[in-house]
Amino acid sequence: MRSSGRKKEQIRPVKITRNFTKYAEGSVLIEVGDTKVLCTASIEEKVPPFLKGSGEGWITAEYNMLPRSTQSRKQREINKLKIDGRTMEIQRLIGRALRSAVDMKALGEKTIWIDCDVLQADGGTRTTSITGSFVALVDAVNKLHQKKPFNVYPIRHFVSAVSVGIVGEEKVLDLCYEEDHVAKVDMNVVMTEEGEFIEIQGTGEAGPFSRKELDELLNLAEKGAKQMIQAQKDALKTDSLWIGTGRE
């Protein structure tokens, strides 16, 4: 039994609140245990220079932690005059994860900006950001579709993310900060609804881990990703992205 009382294969409680802010085309507050992230999706009717005239869209992400999202105050990155390596890595991960879910040709020459602001951090902020941002992305794309229906609906499949790791001798799902801080192995896994992998980030913090342990962790991650996708479906009130558009 873990310190939180959860079983090793149990995720934290998930709450997804849509339309959390007024102005963004997609806006979600996602809470996974004590981790809380505000995710917004904003649409621009233009693309980066390298995509002009291509007929393809683009999705990019920014990630930020509020100063008191952590136990001690974290300095705002704007005051450092640079983005640190961790932040850059995370926002690239979020962008890659969401782009993998979207047909850019079907989207057309538009940019969707994903902004993830961590309000409170207790482990899993990057995976929580991906899971919440996907719901915000669906809401934003559906608003586009309501204004002018797509010939082909751009979002191809559900995407979620979850952390797994080895704490002590136990392989556990959805690590909180207390567990993440002492984990021998820490891994973030991004998956589709069909069980396909988009990204696997794994580190042996206290030494190498075996292929058998890797397979066991990935099996655990698949269970967690499915639960996260079910939370997304519950929030969207649909089992199908097509139903989410109102299309027949």
UniProtKB/Swiss-Prot annotation:
Enzyme class: transferase
Reaction(s) this enzyme catalyzes, per UniProt: tRNA(n+1) + phosphate = tRNA(n) + a ribonucleoside 5'-diphosphate
Single Gene Ontology BP annotation: rRNA processing
InterPro entries assigned to the protein according to its UniProt record, in alphabetical order: ExoRNase_PH_dom1, ExoRNase_PH_dom2, ExoRNase_PH_dom2_sf, PNPase/RNase_PH_dom_sf, Ribosomal_Su5_D2-typ_SF, RNase_PH, RNase_PH_bac-type, RNase_PH_CS
CDD domains, per database record: RNase_PH_bact
Keywords: Nucleotidyltransferase, RNA-binding, rRNA processing, Transferase, tRNA processing, tRNA-binding
Residues given in the record as phosphate binding sites: 86, 124-126
A molecular function (GO) term: 3'-5'-RNA exonuclease activity
EC numbers for this chain: 2.7.7.56
Family: Belongs to the RNase PH family.
Subunit and interaction comment: Homohexameric ring arranged as a trimer of dimers.
Role of this protein: Phosphorolytic 3'-5' exoribonuclease that plays an important role in tRNA 3'-end maturation. Removes nucleotide residues following the 3'-CCA terminus of tRNAs; can also add nucleotides to the ends of RNA molecules by using nucleoside diphosphates as substrates, but this may not be physiologically important. Probably plays a role in initiation of 16S rRNA degradation (leading to ribosome degradation) during starvation.
Protein name: Ribonuclease PH
Source species of the chain: Clostridium perfringens (strain ATCC 13124 / DSM 756 / JCM 1290 / NCIMB 6125 / NCTC 8237 / Type A)
Gene: rph
